[in-house]
Design a protein with these regions (language model features):
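Flexible, glycine-rich surface segments
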Residues: 41-134
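General small-molecule cofactor/ligand-binding pocket signal
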Residues: 2, 90-92, 147
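Extracytoplasmic metal-acquisition and chelation regions
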Residues: 12-13, 20-24, 69-84, 146-147
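Extracytoplasmic substrate-binding proteins
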Residues: 1-67
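Structured C-terminal subdomain patch of bacterial secreted/periplasmic proteins
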Residues: 10-17, 24, 119-147
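Small-side-chain structural scaffolding
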Residues: 23, 32, 85-87, 91, ...
Length: 147
């Protein structure tokens, strides 16, 4: 029995590096190392490109689940991912690496005008999103189709 601890990682590259663990399990160490090296190179190139951005768009993350909206705290890998892309993550001031459980009203108050909405769940279309929760229509990022 092995326990996968990738959820403990605090950086995007830390999460990607778990490919080496799985490569070792299947005797594919060299291939996994090569894949990770490529991911690392491309990630760092993308971060360098993002630093030239002229704007810092606001970013909303997640969606409702069991009447709660879960978002990552400010020191999580997801927040770092957005920060390195020059995004303005709306809960970046929240200390820690876990998640926050928020009400819809709290999220709407803070993120109604967010420029982008990422990771909204397993919806196949914007229509499917709004069919699941009509209140999603209140977010400007959805209205602008920046989801």
């Amino acid at each position: 029995v092995m326990i996968n601890g990738d959820w403990n990682e605090e950086t995007p590259l830390g999460k990607a590096e778990w490919i080496k663990f799985f490569g070792a399990l299947y005797g594919l160490d060299k291939k996994a190392d090569s894949i990770f090296t490529n991911i690392e190179k491309e990630y760092n190139k993308t971060v360098a490109l993002a630093k030239t951005a002229k704007t810092n768009p606001t970013v909303l993350v997640g969606s409702m689940f069991n009447n709660q909206w879960f978002v990552p705290k400010g020191n999580s890998w997801g927040c770092l991912f957005i920060k390195e892309a020059q995004g303005n993550y709306l809960w970046s001031d929240e200390k820690g690496t876990g998640g926050l459980s928020l009400s819809f009203e709290t999220v709407l108050e803070q993120a109604k005008t967010a420029d982008f909405w990422i990771g909204p769940g397993s919806f196949d279309s914007l229509k499917q999103m709004t069919d699941s929760n009509i209140h999603y229509n209140q977010f400007e990022s959805l209205q602008a189709k920046n989801v």
